[in-house]
């Protein structure tokens, strides 16, 4: 509330600044500046108004002035009457008039002013009006803010409520204030009554709102987001916060930027937790075995991008080996996922599932390799050892097939047709490039159908010692085939479906080995009296010549699968 400032004369003759509190018959009640003295009544003749604003005269030597100074350290500054004795530039030598002894002081112009033209106040200098307040408005009139407009309208410097007498006290220095106050009092009280009614309603509504908020804010979630992730949590132009506020049941969301703390208030726990999922961003590290990093990333990053898209994480990065900020386990590479808690959980589920799949696949492949190795070892151990020295073996070894000089080669060479009792002698390593898996199975079946030694003895042989050709086609043609009549009986006592490995006796044998890859090797062993000329391979021409020579030599012949 604005107060009327006056100057009050003290016992030393100086004037102190004070404010009018109340007006009486012959005095006024004032309060002093900074409350250096208690509130007290001052008679009118010791009270005057301050000089008008802008009032200032030129100060010359021998002029009476007022100096703003203090008598001691306990009292505030006040205005003392003095006289100018000398002027030196901006400095003035003054002599105080209130002192018994001559007292001079040098002051500047900012502490000087001309003598106050206002005289002491009188009874007519102040006007006071009292208005009785209705009972229903007494509480309303006790508020100083309720009379702000009324005070301005009547031109008063003070409007206060006297709680003892239930009156509205109006103080003014203008006589017109009394007339205006009496004229506006009814209107003022009526407006106060309307304001009071509205204020009571607003207060009641505010109380209901506060109680509703307290009821609605029973559920509260508080969490902290890392400072470098606050931008993601807030979202572009606060999009994430707006989305969280739209969750049904959420009443308020507050953010403490200094501590990066979110406060979520809601009507139920589910709404609060759902809003939290939109705002709680974090970073999590998943360790991936180093040998599976490439398979996790995929070609052109396809697999890791699928994990990012399906999980909803913001980004994923693979930390370098020399990064000390992320703890690295030996043999693992850290994958760092950034996003909401739910999205990181989804990414962890997807990545763990994929890692388990890759580990199971590797385990199955390892088991297959172990089984293959065991089969290979079993096949090698089941083969009978050779009695010949290494120098006489030539090209015959465990892993390859060939013929020994002095033995008869197979008759089915080139493009000739094979009978049911014949088998190919092609090296497994040379045939793998052109044979399919189905060919291996067919050829394996052909080997299993090879007749035993006893069965081969029952075949009718030609006069020159060669076996009849296979029964293929109407003309029964084929290289080495017999073109004679087929009226001779043929015994059917051989086993056609035998799959057992056939091995001949030591005096002229054929060994057949089938490994786990359906590869086969044919090993032939000549008679003891067969000559061995070397361990080199023979060309087709050499084979023909050797065949002709063998046909003309008297003596035993080596028979392979019944073919000389």
From Swiss-Prot:
Predominant subcellular localization, coarse grouping: nucleus
Keywords: Cell membrane, Cell projection, Centromere, Chromosome, Cytoplasm, Membrane, mRNA processing, mRNA splicing, mRNA transport, Neurogenesis, Nucleus, Postsynaptic cell membrane, Repeat, Repressor, Ribonucleoprotein, RNA-binding, Synapse, Synaptosome, Translation regulation, Transport
Biased composition, class Low complexity, residue ranges: 426-435
Skewed-composition ranges (Gly residues): 471-483
Domain Agenet-like residues, every copy: 4-50, 63-115
Chain positions covered by the region annotation Disordered: 377-510, 529-564
Compartments, record wording: Nucleus; Nucleus, Nucleolus; Chromosome, Centromere; Chromosome
GO cellular component, one term: dendrite
Lineage: superkingdom: Eukaryota
Residue ranges annotated for the KH domain, each copy included: 222-251, 285-314
An example Gene Ontology molecular-function term: dynein complex binding
Entry remark concerning the domains of this protein: The C-terminal disordered region undergoes liquid-liquid phase separation (LLPS) for the formation of a membraneless compartment that concentrates mRNAs with associated regulatory factors.
Quaternary state and interactors: Homodimer. Heterodimer.
Recorded family membership: Belongs to the FMR1 family.
Function: Multifunctional polyribosome-associated RNA-binding protein that plays a central role in neuronal development and synaptic plasticity through the regulation of alternative mRNA splicing, mRNA stability, mRNA dendritic transport and postsynaptic local protein synthesis of target mRNAs. Acts as an mRNA regulator by mediating formation of some phase-separated membraneless compartment: undergoes liquid-liquid phase separation upon binding to target mRNAs, leading to assemble mRNAs into cytoplasmic ribonucleoprotein granules that concentrate mRNAs with associated regulatory factors.
PANTHER family to which the protein is assigned, alphabetical: FRAGILE X MENTAL RETARDATION SYNDROME-RELATED PROTEIN, FRAGILE X MESSENGER RIBONUCLEOPROTEIN 1
Name of protein: Fragile X messenger ribonucleoprotein 1 homolog B
């Amino acid at each position: 509330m604005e107060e009327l400032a006056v100057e009050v004369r003290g016992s030393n003759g100086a004037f102190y600044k004070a404010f009018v509190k109340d007006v009486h018959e012959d005095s006024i009640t004032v309060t002093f500046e900074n409350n250096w003295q208690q509130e007290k009544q001052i008679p009118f003749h010791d009270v005057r108004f301050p000089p008008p604003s802008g009032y200032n005269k030129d100060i010359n030597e021998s002029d009476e002035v007022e100096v703003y100074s203090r008598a001691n350290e306990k009292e505030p500054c006040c205005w003392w009457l003095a006289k100018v004795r000398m002027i030196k530039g901006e400095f003035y030598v003054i002599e105080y008039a209130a002192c018994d002894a001559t007292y001079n002081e040098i002051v500047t112009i900012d502490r000087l002013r001309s003598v106050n033209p206002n005289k002491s106040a009188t009874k007519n200098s102040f006007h006071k009006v009292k208005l009785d307040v209705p009972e229903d408005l007494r509480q309303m009139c006790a508020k100083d803010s309720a009379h702000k407009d009324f005070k301005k309208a009547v031109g008063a410097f003070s409007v206060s409520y006297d709680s003892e007498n239930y009156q509205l006290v109006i103080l003014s220095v203008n006589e017109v204030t009394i007339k205006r106050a009496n004229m506006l009092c009814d209107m003022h009280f009526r407006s106060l009554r309307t304001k009071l009614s509205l204020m009571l309603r607003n207060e009641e509504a505010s109380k209901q709102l506060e109680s509703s908020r307290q009821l609605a804010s029973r559920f509260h979630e508080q969490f902290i987001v890392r400072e470098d992730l606050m931008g993601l949590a807030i979202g572009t132009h606060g999009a994430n916060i707006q989305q969280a506020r739209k969750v049904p049941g959420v009443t308020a969301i507050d953010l403490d930027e200094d501590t990066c703390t979110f406060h979520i208030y809601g009507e139920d726990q589910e709404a609060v937790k759902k809003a939290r999922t939109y705002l709680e961003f974090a970073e999590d590290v998943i360790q991936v075995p180093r040998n599976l990093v490439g398979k996790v990333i995929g070609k052109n990053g396809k697999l890791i991008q699928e994990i990012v898209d399906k999980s909803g994480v913001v980004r994923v990065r693979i930390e370098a080996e020399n990064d000390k900020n992320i703890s690295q386990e030996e043999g693992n590479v850290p994958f760092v996922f950034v996003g909401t808690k739910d999205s990181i959980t989804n990414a962890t589920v997807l990545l763990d599932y994929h890692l388990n799949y890759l580990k199971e696949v590797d385990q199955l492949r390892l088991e297959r390799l172990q089984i293959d190795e065991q089969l290979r070892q079993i096949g090698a151990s089941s083969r009978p050892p050779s009695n010949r020295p290494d120098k006489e073996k030539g090209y015959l070894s465990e892993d390859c097939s060939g013929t020994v000089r002095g033995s008869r080669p197979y008759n089915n060479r080139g493009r000739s047709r094979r009978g049911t009792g014949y088998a190919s002698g092609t090296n497994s390593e040379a045939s793998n490039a052109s044979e399919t898996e189905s060919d291996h199975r067919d050829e394996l079946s052909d080997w299993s159908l090879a007749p035993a030694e006893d069965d081969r003895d029952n075949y009718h042989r030609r006069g020159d010692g060669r076996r009849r050709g296979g029964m293929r086609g109407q003309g029964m043609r084929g290289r080495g085939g017999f073109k004679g009549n087929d009226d001779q009986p043929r015994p059917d006592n051989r086993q056609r479906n035998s799959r057992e490995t056939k091995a001949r006796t030591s005096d002229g044998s054929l060994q057949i080995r089938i490994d786990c890859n359906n590869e086969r090797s044919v090993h032939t062993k000549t008679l003891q009296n067969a000559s061995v000329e070397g361990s080199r391979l023979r060309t087709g021409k050499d084979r023909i010549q050797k065949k002709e020579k063998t046909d003309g030599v008297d003596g035993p012949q080596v028979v392979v699968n019944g073919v000389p």
